[in-house]
């Protein structure tokens, strides 16, 4: 179907398209077919990487390997295209990469290509093994290269490169050396500084956003799961694999005590290793006898939808006889719990199994069982769960990081077992020093603690309408303002009692109506009066805290906005 659509599109441009399907193709058939078709471009799928080496050896055409919509150019040969395909080139193609290109031929965006060297010594000696990777390289760039090549005045590319034929084969062409020298001096200064052990000051402002920006510019290949084992994360988009009980029994050593990890609300968790070497966590379901196959498989389907780089991913399952097991990827570096509360605590987070509705749709009535300390109040009361429930859970995690306490700790005294209930009075009474983990001994960044406590204050609000969105929480953690309208008399401070910083938290940019503007003005007036009354009160021994002021502004602003919307 795709090739048929391409044929119809190119017919308008007088481009003849021929499609041929070869069955039981042997190794090396691609170079021979390319010679038969006299192809100038050979585009290979990622599953045909092995054929790429043969094409480099036997062909002189342009060769590209496409992996996840990102092409890797093995050879870009724009030289002497008018010659017959089987005619020998005057320059040995094995000693020149990008043969036929000079600096004047390369378009403006071409210098964004990344040069990668092969890790193996055998391939490193062959220049053809070096790949030019273009993360978002489009055919328009290649077309521009072709046009510039035909229109370019001056010596031909072959004349430019002929001066390099007398040099030893081990040396790169002069054009390539000049190109690399320009890139090294212009774009790779950071790498040079790193090699010289030059330390640079760390800018903590918007550090999270910078990391996301760097992640987008990095290689499309998923990063290692952790810095210890360097295991890659499972490929996203794959359906969960169905294991047999014998396979999981073999992987866990017969569910031996040596591989025991934790005892959860739904069953025991064991560490295992699959035949391909991947470490997994296998969870046995205690309530397996009460579930049918269809119900269990429906729950597995729901869990498999949770595929994100920072989430533990479901790899597979087992539904054999009355046995029900789930197979997750194993995080050998441990979870947040293990680093905060000790290595012996459970290392696999489990929020229970969600269930489909009878009509097969997933809605707010879906039950998510477990992890009581992280569940939002509206869920525990009504059973309804929305995206603001995730915001509440994230606020609890922030409090865990600041206080070093568990979300629920039954070993503590009454009133201190639930982290949110224990922290709210300190947040309300501005006793923030009571919230900070004493084990830190003052070794923390005050601004970061400010941002975390402010975000946690808003996230754990009992009213879900008042809680910010996760995008707003991200900006809070970075120390940014959350709206275009922000009034601050001085820098805010949670711990040093600095003057109040007034900040409207809301997305004013999305709605410029007069009703929202008037509600914003009313918020400013209302919490200016609140600030004055709080400071003049006889019971107030310190100025109104910025976190409380900002939280109050957010609450009033949201309520006023909701009221205007309903009107």
Curated annotation (Swiss-Prot):
Binding positions (ATP): 261-269, 283
SUPFAM superfamilies according to UniProt: Protein kinase-like (PK-like) (SSF56112)
Keywords: ATP-binding, Nucleotide-binding
Domain of life: Eukaryota
Ranges where the Protein kinase domain occurs: 255-487
Compositionally biased region (Basic residues): 556-567
SS bond list: none
Amino acid composition bias (Basic and acidic residues), ranges on this chain: 180-189
Cleavable signal peptide: none
Biased composition (Low complexity): 196-206, 511-538
UniProt region (Disordered), positions on chain: 148-206, 511-567
Biased segments, Polar residues type: 159-169
One Pfam family, short name: PK_Tyr_Ser-Thr
PROSITE patterns named in the record: PROTEIN_KINASE_DOM
Family matches, as Gene3D superfamilies: Phosphorylase Kinase, domain 1, Transferase(Phosphotransferase) domain 1
InterPro entries found in the cross-reference section: Kinase-like_dom_sf, Prot_kinase_dom, Ser-Thr/Tyr_kinase_cat_dom
GO molecular function: ATP binding; protein kinase activity
Note on domains (UniProt): The protein kinase domain is predicted to be catalytically inactive.
Name of the protein in question: Inactive protein kinase SELMODRAFT_444075
UniProt organism field: Selaginella moellendorffii
